Amino acid sequence: PWTCFFAEIDAIKEIDFEKELWLDSHGYSALDDQTMFYKAWLRGIKTAVVPDAVYQHLDAKTSTKNNKPAFLYSSVYNRIIFWHRFIFKQQHCFGKVWSVLCIGYRLFWMLLLDIIDLIRNRMTYKELKIKIKAFVDGCRYLHSKEYQKMDLVC
């Protein structure tokens, strides 16, 4: 379930990951692997997956106790930023409309399934509130001066 990667130094430098500090702004860098691989793909850097590789994953804060609130918050917050930065901004008129419909569809089902989990006691009301707050905060960040100053990804 985790990612382990090896890369050439020049390829990592070309990804320019330093410009994605927003990923780690809330104590848990959710979607960092997705962002790294997507930026590599945008730049034409080839990647390969070895599905049967065996390695010992030391820690990426996943083993830290009481980390669930930070994970929930960052997962939703970072997904909104990722969508806007890498999907929405890269599209033309029709693509932008389509990407809004797609993220809306995903968010609708995420909320519906979260409500079902809440009813089935698989999620607490506090956890649902964290996810909703992360969504609102992520949308607000899209309008912030800090976000507006970021370079385009291409």
Task: Name each region found by the language model.
Residues 44-59:
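Catalytic beta-strand/loop signature of glycosyltransferases that borders the donor
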Residues 70-78, 91-154:
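Non-catalytic, C-terminal membrane-associated alpha-helical segments of glycosyltransferases
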Residues 12-13, 22, 56:
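Nucleotide phosphate-binding site architecture
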